[in-house]
Curated annotation (Swiss-Prot):
Phosphorylated by CheA. Phosphorylation of the N-terminal regulatory domain activates the methylesterase activity. This is Protein-glutamate methylesterase/protein-glutamine glutaminase 5. Pfam families: CheB_methylest (PF01339), Response_reg (PF00072). Keywords: Chemotaxis, Cytoplasm, Hydrolase, Phosphoprotein.
Length: 362
């Protein structure tokens, strides 16, 4: 296990940058509640952030996009060019903020999370988990060459909390191939590369990318404009058909189902599974039950272990399984845990995954 930010060596040092004093206070309190994180300060704009960074170097910055004097995107570009550092974008759950947040990922931000809002106790706890996990993932990813991530070992709800009881093996008798994909930290760019390399008649795909609600719709629209396959945010009941990729909506679980000879998705609420909603484990386990040997499972870059057990269940059901390799993963957590469990038939660099998918689905 490597020493450095986010490991047992010392806490991750975080600088909070947001123009709202209330938000700065809230974010600092949420982050400070995690013993693996140390908040070294807060700044109301990028200029104040630079002054703070000169006094004490943070490991990670949380950054708002809408700020006075200099907007977050401009500051991010300057940071990446002059002083690369892991950045987590903290954005409001507003549709207008989705596109700038995606641009921030393209500019070098590691993660995008929603700002914590007032709500139920469960909602506040989930917001805390997501924010703290994002900061730790960013620290592991780093601004330069990716660093490996040790899988988190945490008490967690299993996918049984969301999945219905399995059906008989009779549901597996269909010839349609379906590809299920799971990704987290670093996944937005990895998925873009994966989907852009597929032809317009590629097998149907269902994808879980850990991302807040609202942002997944904008992410799907952006991919749709770049890829030969059609890409859309999944809606309950959407058919899984060749030439289309369905992106699981943020904050809801997406499951694969079968009706007659066709596959479709079910989108539903439910508890966090492996600290996430949507959960890769939920998607993979549903694919194991309803598609089995007709499925191909792919686990990609990401921190933690979401999807590792689901990929193992897919393999046991007869599906082909692939894990992204360490060299091309931004954070080698989810794939490494899947490999450790013996869940991956193949461990491949990112550029080799699209042609292998097509070969397996011929």
């Amino acid at each position: 296990m490597p020493h450095g930010p986010g490991t047992s060596a010392r806490p991750v040092r975080v600088l909070v940058v947001d123009d709202s004093a209330l938000v700065r206070e809230t974010l600092a309190a949420v982050l400070a509640s995690d013993p693996g994180i140390e908040v070294i300060g807060a700044a109301g704009d990028p200029y104040a952030a630079v002054e703070r960074m000169r006094r004490q170097a943070p490991d990670v910055i949380t950054l708002d996009i809408e700020m006075p004097r200099m907007d977050g995107l401009t500051f991010l570009r300057k940071l990446m060019a002059q002083h690369p550092i892991p950045v987590v974008i903290c954005s409001s759950l507003a549709t207008a903020g989705a596109e700038p947040a995606l641009r921030a990922l393209e500019c070098g931000a590691v993660e995008v999370v929603a700002k914590p809002r007032l709500g139920t106790r469960r909602f506040l706890e989930e917001s805390r988990v997501r924010l703290c996990d994002a900061v730790k993932a960013a620290a592991r990813a780093g601004p330069g060459r990716p660093r490996a991530s040790a899988p988190l070992v945490q008490a967690k709800l299993t996918a049984d909390a969301v999945l219905a009881r399995p059906r008989s093996d009779a549901v597996l008798q269909t010839t349609e191939r379906v590809v299920v994909v799971g990704a987290s930290t670093g996944g937005t760019e990895a998925l873009r590369e994966l989907l852009a390399a597929l032809p317009g008649d590629a097998p149907g795909l269902v994808i879980v990318q850990h991302m807040p609600e609202v942002f997944t719709a904008a992410f799907a629209r952006r991919l749709d404009g770049l890829c030969a396959v059609a890409v859309k945010e999944a809606a309950d009941g959407d058919a899984v058909v060749p030439g289309r990729a369905l992106i699981a909506p943020g904050n809801r679980h997406t499951l694969l189902r079968r009706s007659g000879a066709r596959y479709h998705v079910e989108v539903r609420d439910g508890p966090l599974v492996c600290r996430h909603r949507p959960s890769v484990d939920v998607l993979f386990r549903s694919a194991a039950r309803y598609a089995g040997r007709n499925a191909v499972g792919v686990i990609m870059t990401g921190m933690g272990d979401d999807g590792a057990r689901g990929l193992a269940e897919l393999k046991r059901s007869g599906a082909d399984t692939i894990a992204q390799d360490e060299a091309t993963s931004v954070v080698f957590g989810m794939p490494r845990e899947a490999i450790r469990l013996g869940a991956a038939d193949r461990v491949l660099p990112l550029p080799a995954i699209p042609p292998e998918l097509l070969r397996l689905c011929r």
